[in-house]
């Protein structure tokens, strides 16, 4: 049985906009979230939820990012919850990257209803392509805080892309969801590896496909298709050091880039236009 994209997302939109007191909801992020919670009593949704959400909103209050990025927006729950938290922390921009155009449209409508249009911007398309555009356009040169909750094999490839572009540096914070269930062994292995271990792996050259080790076939193929590959072949930057903490039972891995070790031995962002792409 499908647990998403079976019409329930549009039903949510009709449920919320069909409320008799819709005027009282307008401009109030929490009331929009409350309505999503109410609808979830009858329908399962792949939202971050209240418990994991608090871990991230506490992180936002601590980091106080000027700009935050999320990979995987679904129907906008996280964009509303975290976008509001970013604004309250003094931030100015929240980018929500979503592959599915229908989900992105729903997110836009709910963000508008919540009164967060001034801070939340939804980008439709592949996350790797959108990250590249954010960097090359000059809109985001440095990742302050990034919430990762999209295509599971894309966690590590998108992180390596950000590393390659120079978007990750000391002070960057990553919050990756669902690393325990359904699980993401390749991502956990990477952010927990030493610089020496990553340098050794990098000698094999860039990865030309998604690393799906330990990821179920359903999870690996549900969103992107069996033969899908990353747009860019990248090694990343193995010289970056991460300090990681796994929040249990939430299954949310928070990784802090603490330092950079050694000279730059791999390609820099200036050579990006010469990098193999698909």
Regions found by a protein language model. Name each.
Residues 85-86, 111-114, 138, 165-166, ...:
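Active-site catalytic pocket residues across diverse enzymes, especially alpha/beta-hydrolases
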Residues 2, 81, 106-108, 132-135, ...:
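Short, well-ordered secondary-structure micro-motifs
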Residues 6, 23-27, 41-54:
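Conserved SAM-binding loop and adjacent beta-strand
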Residues 154-278:
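C-terminal substrate-binding/active-site "lid" region of AdoMet-derived donor-dependent transferases
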Residues 7, 11, 31, 77, ...:
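Short alpha-helical
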């Amino acid at each position: 049985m499908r647990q998403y994209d079976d019409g329930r997302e549009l039903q949510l939109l009709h449920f919320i906009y069909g409320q008799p007191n819709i005027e009282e909801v307008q401009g109030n992020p929490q009331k929009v979230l409350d309505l999503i919670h109410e609808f979830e009593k009858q329908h399962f949704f792949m939202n971050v939820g209240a418990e994991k959400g608090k871990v991230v909103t506490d992180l936002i209050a601590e980091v106080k990012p000027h700009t935050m990025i999320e990979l995987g927006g679904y129907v906008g729950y996280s964009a509303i919850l975290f976008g509001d938290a970013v604004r309250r922390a003094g931030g100015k921009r929240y980018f929500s990257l979503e592959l599915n155009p229908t989900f992105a449209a729903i997110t836009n409508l709910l963000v508008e209803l919540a009164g967060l249009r001034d801070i939340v911007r939804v980008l439709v398309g592949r996350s790797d392509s959108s990250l590249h555009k954010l960097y090359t356009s000059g809109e985001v040169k440095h990742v302050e805080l990034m919430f990762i909750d999209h295509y599971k094999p894309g966690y590590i490839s998108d992180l390596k892309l950000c590393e390659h572009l120079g978007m990750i540096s000391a002070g960057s914070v990553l919050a990756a969801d669902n690393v325990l269930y359904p699980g993401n062994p390749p991502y956990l292995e990477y952010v927990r590896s030493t610089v020496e271990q990553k340098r050794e792996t990098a000698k094999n050259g860039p990865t030309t496909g998604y690393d799906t080790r330990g990821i179920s076939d359903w999870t690996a193929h549900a969103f992107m298709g069996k033969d899908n590959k990353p747009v860019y072949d990248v090694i990343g930057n193995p010289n970056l050091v991460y300090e990681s903490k796994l929040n249990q039972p939430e299954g949310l891995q928070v990784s802090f880039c603490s330092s950079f070790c050694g000279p730059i031995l791999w390609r820099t962002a200036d050579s990006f236009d010469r990098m193999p792409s698909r």
